[in-house]
Amino acid sequence: MVMGLHLLFLVFILGLGLTPPTLAQNDLRYNRFLEEHYDPKTKNGNDRYCDKMMRLRNMISPCKAINTFIHGKKESIKAICGTENGVPYNGNKRKSKSAFQVTICKHRGGSPRPPCQYRATAGSRNVVVACENGLPVHLDESIFRP
C-alpha cells in the first residue's frame, strides 16, 4: 500500500513537470487580466470607486493612466474569445457581441506617484480583448454603443 502511494505520488509529480509552460503562462496572463479588469460586485463605479479599486489592485505605483473594470459574469467575458460572445476584430483581437457594464478610471493628472486620484466614467460598452488559448489576456479597448 505504501509503495503504491509512493508510485502514485511520483507519477503525479512527473505529470506536473510535463505540463506545458505555455498553459501555465496563459493561466497567469488570464489571472492578471482578471485582477486588472474584472469586478463583478459593482455595476457603476464613481470617482471614489476608482481611487479605491486602483489602490486595491496595486495599480498606483506609478499611477496607471487609465484602466477599465468590466462588471459582468466571468463566463461571458471568457466567451468573447469564442463564437458565443465574440467576433473577430482588427486583426487577432475579439470584440464582444454583447455590451458589458464598465467603469473607466482615468488618472486626473499631476504627479504619477501616490496618492493617485481618478475620474470615473461608467456605462454600457462592447469590449475588445486579445485572447490566448481561449482566454482573454489583454483588454484593448471598450467601444461605446450608440
Curated annotation (Swiss-Prot):
Active site: H37 (proton acceptor), H138 (proton donor)
Keywords tagged on the record: Angiogenesis, Cytoplasm, Developmental protein, Differentiation, Disulfide bond, DNA-binding, Endonuclease, Hydrolase, Nuclease, Nucleus, Protein synthesis inhibitor, Pyrrolidone carboxylic acid, Secreted, Signal, Stress response
UniProt GO BP: actin filament polymerization; angiogenesis; antibacterial humoral response; antimicrobial humoral immune response mediated by antimicrobial peptide; defense response to Gram-positive bacterium; hematopoietic stem cell proliferation; innate immune response; negative regulation of apoptotic process
Disulfide bonds listed in the record: C50-C105, C63-C116, C81-C131
Compartmental location: Secreted; Nucleus; Nucleus, Nucleolus; Cytoplasm, Stress granule
UniProt signal peptide: 1-24
Described purpose of this protein according to its UniProt entry: Secreted ribonuclease that can either promote or restrict cell proliferation of target cells, depending on the context. Endocytosed in target cells via its receptor PLXNB2 and translocates to the cytoplasm or nucleus. Under stress conditions, localizes to the cytoplasm and promotes the assembly of stress granules (SGs): specifically cleaves a subset of tRNAs within anticodon loops to produce tRNA-derived stress-induced fragments (tiRNAs), resulting in translation repression and inhibition of cell proliferation. tiRNas also prevent formation of apoptosome, thereby promoting cell survival.
The protein's name: Angiogenin
UniProt binding sites for tRNA: C105, V127
